[in-house]
């Protein structure tokens, strides 16, 4: 327990909360270039081949981002927009690629939950 004099000398520091998406530097989205597009397996008890991309952002960070939806057109040197949001069963993946912007096209034949996958309303 500190004395009153010690508290006067240097006050208590508030506990700073760490950001969950440091590479975005406080921005809602960031632009980046795909360095490598590949699949990876989730941790137990799940089993799949999750599509992810290694992205170099304009903020200088190099991150791993998840590619949501069924099928994609991304390859090396594709320019993508990245938002925050982790994938629970992929350790180290704390970002999502935004579908329907820049080089990432929307998901084909998607009818429900379209706004998340960059799909226009069908006629």
UniProtKB/Swiss-Prot annotation:
Cellular component aspect of the GO annotation: chloroplast; small ribosomal subunit
InterPro entries: NA-bd_OB-fold (IPR012340), Ribosomal_uS12 (IPR006032), Ribosomal_uS12_bac (IPR005679)
Principal place of residence: plastid
Gene3D superfamilies assigned: Nucleic acid-binding proteins
Alphabetic keyword roster: Chloroplast, Plastid, Ribonucleoprotein, Ribosomal protein, RNA-binding, rRNA-binding
One annotated GO biological process: translation
SUPFAM superfamilies: Nucleic acid-binding proteins (SSF50249)
Pfam family, one: Ribosom_S12_S23
GO MF: rRNA binding; structural constituent of ribosome
Places the protein is found: Plastid, Chloroplast
Function: With S4 and S5 plays an important role in translational accuracy. Located at the interface of the 30S and 50S subunits.
Family of the protein in this entry: Belongs to the universal ribosomal protein uS12 family.
Assembly mode: Part of the 30S ribosomal subunit.
Protein name, as recorded: Small ribosomal subunit protein uS12cz/uS12cy
High-level lineage: Eukaryota, Viridiplantae, Streptophyta, Embryophyta, Tracheophyta
Gene for this chain: rps12-A
């Amino acid at each position: 327990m500190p004395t009153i004099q010690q508290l006067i000398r240097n006050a208590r520091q508030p506990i700073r909360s760490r950001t969950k998406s440091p590479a975005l530097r406080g921005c809602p989205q960031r632009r980046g270039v795909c360095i490598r597009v590949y699949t990876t397996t989730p941790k137990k008890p799940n089993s799949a081949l999750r599509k992810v991309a290694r992205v170099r952002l304009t903020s200088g960070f190099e991150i791993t981002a998840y590619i949501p939806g069924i099928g994609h057109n991304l390859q090396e040197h594709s320019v993508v927009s990245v938002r925050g949001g982790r994938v629970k069963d992929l350790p180290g993946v704390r970002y999502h690629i935004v579908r329907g912007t820049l080089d990432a096209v929307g998901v084909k034949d998607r009818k429900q939950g379209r706004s998340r996958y960059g799909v226009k309303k069908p006629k």
